[in-house]
Design a protein with these regions (language model features):
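Aromatic-rich juxtamembrane segments at the membrane interface
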Residues: 158-290, 296, 595, 602, ...
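Non-globular, low-confidence helical/coil segments that flank catalytic cores
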Residues: 122-135, 161, 352-358, 413-753
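N-terminal leader/targeting segments
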Residues: 1-74, 164-167, 179, 286, ...
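Internal transmembrane alpha-helical bundles of multi-pass membrane proteins
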Residues: 13, 280-460, 472, 645-658, ...
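Structural signal for the C-terminal ends of transmembrane alpha-helices
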Residues: 22, 39-48, 64-66, 245-252, ...
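Alpha-helical transmembrane segments
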Residues: 4-18, 267-269, 311-315, 370
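Membrane-interface helix/helix-cap signal primarily in integral membrane proteins
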Residues: 2, 58-226, 532, 536-540, ...
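Membrane-interface micro-motifs in multi-pass membrane enzymes
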Residues: 4-5, 22-29, 228-236, 277-291, ...
Length: 753
């Protein structure tokens, strides 16, 4: 059976899709057995069987690659490793580095193993390209997982950096920095004094670590963040720069030496150099591969359709690196190119409007409008929101960045040590300043998208497709049937009467009680050096769920429970706070307080009125019930407070679900308390790699002995309790809400206990 390259490409893309959806990977023996069966089936003289066998065979290659990534985790995350490494990248603050293991125990490592490590404090300056002998303590990346949150595990796998750890000791083998690192350092010294040097570094070298949080937020909210990541547009500009350079050189050559291959070769050379200078990040690599394929097609003299080239590029990328299918930036790039092809194929600008220089603004508007409409569903899915100012912001920023800033940077990179180098960098900096000045003038236009609206976001794209193919004329009944089926499916999704969600905030606590679109927060998570759980996790989660928080209950005053308070109050200034901290603006949270909220009964059982210090044993213990199901929230109380609580309110403690006190420490969860509560489920908020190795193994066993099903956020991610009139159920993110092989607990089972 003869198959075209386009057909093989489509089969490859189909074969890669299950890698996104599988809850777990088959064993290596199963993969080999499937591959052997597929090879046998390829000789069957039936077209459909042969096609299926080819898909299975390519799927086996994808699964084998994924298995290989997990094998690296299992092999290199158990003991301290003596390794020879090369430094790939160092963070601007010099505290962390990405390394590549060359040898382990004097054995060469293949395929390469990458890790992100904390560097030891010493006088030596690290830089990319250096070779070191290190003793490494590595462990798998373990992500905090919540609905709509950044998926660090998936990101780490897609970028082949699933190991992290620390350097126990290090001795230098070769301290010479790489040519790129030396060039970067020398070049930065020329423009480092300029106001927007961080943006220049991002555009020239692909290093975005110097961009401030405020600037990153500005680019995200105006929909211009893609301009700061070196990708197809930037590599294309470099290729165009190379083509112009080559054509200029050809004016100096004899006519017999002038041909079409020379400009193509220089185009590839310049684009390749820029890809290398930019650090060869995945988006730049993808663009370079696409350029190579396009060049090969041009040289071959074949006339391929845009969709065929797209299929071939996507298939080639997935064959070379199957885990790329887990990358959100890959999907954004792929859909962006597909949107361009579809827009110009389906909705071309009329010829009467596309003639002459005056038509360029209209062409740009046509392009941006098409990208905005067609990319709407993908952007909403990836970013959980949309920028309302993206169209005008991009209409302003893209011409300046693409026609002025990047060409100036390319000229400056091509003319190092020349008299005009510093002037070129200054001009590039001024162009960036103008763009940022205009972006800051736009009103805040970021719109968080609720889960319930994600389907509606797809309607403009669906309407365009229906109109373009004339389905509303040719198949109105089928179209109406599909719409009715979708509406019925959406309306019949079972909804709980109320729910309780323990968010995965690492070491800390944040619980959301929600009903009828309103919410109460019990604690607000931790605060870290540059962010907090409120800003990073809780606020985006509430916005995605379409919830309006009305109250915050602070269990006590420790930072891992109050870290996100300020950010949440800034987002919702009218929110009320209840605590036992004797704060002037806080409502009291002491034993004896009770109230109703949307037919839910809240009763405070602890602490005593005199307790205001905000320590663990002064935690505000709250019982919530609807008359059928009860939940007991205990904060961080320990043995002393637990026994006092038992003595004072033994008969009021009964509940179905218990929030495990003090993250499951060995100083809490006494057996009499567990028997008095007589619950069925125990929920613990804890980080996998916490310094205290919580929850304690003895405490977990104590819960199990008393009939509780034990859940913790380190294992499950977000834990959701959905309550209906018929009962309740506990759903973990990793095991129920989104069970995927790349969400699982990698490495030694429960190795932080």
């Amino acid at each position: 059976m003869n198959l075209s390259l386009n057909q093989l490409a489509i089969l490859t893309i189909i074969a890669a899709l299950p890698l996104m959806l599988l809850p777990e990977l088959p064993s290596r023996s199963t993969i080999l057995a499937l591959a052997a069966l597929a090879i046998v089936c390829t000789v069957v003289p039936l077209r459909n069987i042969t096609l299926l066998a080819l898909v299975v065979l390519m799927l086996c290659w994808m699964l084998w690659s994924a298995r290989g990534a997990l094998w690296q985790v299992e092999t290199y995350s158990q003991n301290i490793l003596p390794a020879r490494v090369v430094v790939d990248r160092v963070t601007p603050d010099g505290k962390r580095a990405q390394i590549r293991l060359l040898t382990v125990h004097e054995r060469w490592v293949f395929p390469p193993v990458h890790a992100s490590v904390a560097l030891p404090k010493q006088d030596h300056v690290y830089c990319a390209g250096q070779r070191w002998q290190m003793r490494l303590k590595l462990r798998p990346v373990h992500s905090q997982l919540n609905e709509g949150d950044f998926d660090q595990q998936r990101y780490a796998l897609a970028n082949h950096h699933i190991l992290q750890g620390q350097v126990m000791s290090a001795s230098v083998i070769d301290e010479k920095c790489s040519i790129r690192s030396q060039f970067l350092t020398n070049t930065q010294s020329v423009y480092q004094h300029l106001p927007w040097s961080g943006v220049l570094t991002a555009l020239a070298f692909g290093e975005r670590g110097e961009l401030s949080a405020e600037l990153s937020k500005l680019f995200r909210e105006t929909g211009t963040a893609h301009l700061m990541a070196i990708s197809g547009m930037h590599i294309g500009l470099a290729a165009g720069f190379g083509w112009i350079l080559a054509r200029g050189l050809q004016f100096l050559l004899p006519a017999k030496w002038i041909g079409h291959l020379f400009p193509l070769a220089i185009t590839l050379l310049v684009a390749g150099l820029y890809t290398w200078l930019s650090g060869a990040h995945p988006p730049a690599q993808r663009a370079m591969l696409a350029l190579l394929l396009w060049t090969a097609i041009r040289v071959s003299g074949k006339n391929w359709h845009g969709w065929h080239i797209w299929n071939l590029c996507i298939a080639a990328l997935l064959l070379l690196d199957p885990l790329m299918i887990l990358s959100e930036s890959f999907w954004l790039s792929a859909f962006a190119v597909a949107a361009l092809i579809a827009w110009y194929q389906w909705f071309p600008l009329p010829e009467s409007l596309s003639q002459g220089i005056k038509s360029y603004p209209l062409k740009l508007l046509h392009l941006q409008a098409g990208m905005m409409i067609l990319m709407l569903p993908v952007q909403a899915w990836v970013f959980s929101g949309l920028s309302l100012s993206a169209l005008p912001a991009n209409l302003m920023a893209i011409p300046v960045i693409s026609l002025l800033t990047v060409p100036l940077i390319l000229l400056a990179l091509a003319l190092p040590f020349s008299p005009i180098e510093e002037m070129l960098w200054w001009l590039a900096d001024r162009s960036v300043a103008a763009v940022i000045l205009c972006l800051r003038a736009f009103p805040s236009g970021w719109l968080a998208i609720e889960d319930a609206l994600l389907m509606l976001i797809c309607l403009p794209l669906a309407a365009l497709i229906v109109w373009r193919f004339g389905w509303w004329r040719h198949a109105p009944l089928s179209l109406a049937g599909c719409c009715c089926a979708l509406a019925i499916w959406r309306l019949t999704i079972p909804k709980p009467e109320w729910r309780v969600d323990m968010l995965d905030v690492g070491h800390g606590l944040a619980i959301v009680i929600s009903k009828q679109g309103k919410a109460i927060l019990y604690d607000t998570g931790n605060r870290w050096l540059n962010s907090n759980a409120g800003e990073r996790i809780i606020i985006p989660w509430l916005e995605r769920k379409g919830l309006q928080p009305e109250w915050i209950i602070l269990s006590h005053g420790h930072l891992d429970h109050t870290g996100g308070l300020q950010a949440i109050q800034q987002r919702w200034p009218d929110i009320s706070v209840r605590s036992a901290l004797a704060h002037d603006r806080h409502f009291p949270c002491h034993a004896g307080e009770s109230w109703q909220w949307y037919q839910l009964n809240f009763s405070v059982l602890w602490p005593r009125t005199s307790s205001t210090s905000g320590g663990n044993n002064d935690s505000c213990v709250v019982r919530i019930d609807d008359g059928r199901t009860a939940i007991l929230l205990t904060g961080d109380i320990e043995r002393e407070a637990e026994l006092a609580l038992l003595a004072a309110h033994r008969h009021q403690l009964r509940a179905d679900i218990l929030q495990v006190p003090h993250h499951g420490s060995s100083t809490s969860s006494v057996a009499p308390l567990l028997r008095a509560v007589a619950g069925k489920a125990a929920l613990t908020s804890v980080a996998r790699y916490n310094a205290w190795r919580m929850p304690s193994r003895q405490v977990i066993e104590r819960y199990q002995q008393n009939g509780y099903a034990a859940y913790d956020t380190a294992t499950e991610g977000q834990i959701s309790v959905q309550i209906t009139s018929n009962g309740w159920q506990v759903l973990g993110f990793r095991t129920h809400l989104l069970p995927r092989w790349y969400h699982q607990w990698f490495g030694v089972p429960r190795d932080s206990r």
